[in-house]
A protein has these predicted regions:
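Terminal beta-strand-rich extracellular "head" domains
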Residues: 45, 51-61, 70-150, 154-188
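Short, solvent-exposed loop/turn segments enriched in Ser/Thr/Gly
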Residues: 63-65
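Glycine-rich, low-complexity segments
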Residues: 2-52, 188
Length: 188
């Protein structure tokens, strides 16, 4: 049996063959979403090359890439799920192997909060035929902070060990090596 719900003479919802359709309306701020629902999503892309020679995370412009995303978190109980697809390479100038590390950090200025350190995310061996070997690294982590409002996440890179190599992000500024980072607010 088909039917409808009216509020002040306006059809709000209708039912037909077991399917309920909400016709009009806006969800208010007191709506509670079931756990696991994605309620916000932001994504950013970057192809600006960055060369890093640091062997430790400096938390500044020497190691933080231009790849960042800001999400306006609504609920303190939500988690933020972060996905990052980063084009990374290690330039060893033909001198064997090298390893690049990456981490996701939160903040707009120092001190930053580390969300996840992906140690040794790209390891290369260059026998001398080429000077840089790279890969696309897919990084994923979650932030369980109770903070709300604008949260900004960055990709930071460094070299492993003390080798005098270069860790490179996103290729050659041609736009051919685009990396991305996305943030999702997930209800709990």
């Amino acid at each position: 049996m088909a039917g409808e719900i009216q509020l002040n003479g306006t059809s709000f919802a209708s039912e037909s063959s077991g399917t309920i359709t909400v016709n009009n309306g806006t969800l208010g701020s007191s709506v509670v979403f079931p756990a696991g629902h994605i309620i916000k999503m932001e994504i950013a892309h970057d192809s600006t090359q960055k060369t890093v020679t640091a062997t430790s995370y400096a938390g500044g412009s020497s190691t933080i890439t231009n790849l960042s995303v800001t999400i306006n978190k609504t609920f303190s109980s939500s988690k933020i799920l972060i996905f990052c697809s980063a084009n990374l390479s290690v330039d060893t100038s033909g001198n064997g192997g090298g390893t690049a590390c990456a981490r996701i950090i939160r903040g707009t200025s120092a001190p930053y909060t580390e969300i996840k350190d992906f140690a040794g995310v790209v390891t290369t061996y260059d026998p001398g035929a080429i000077s840089a070997v790279g890969a696309s690294a897919f990084l994923q982590c979650e932030d369980t902070t109770t903070l709300t409002g604008n949260l900004t996440y960055h990709l930071e890179i460094k070299l492993a060990g003390s080798a005098a190599f270069n860790a490179k992000f996103s290729g050659d500024n041609s736009g051919d090596f685009v990396s991305s980072i996305s943030a999702y607010e997930v209800t709990q």
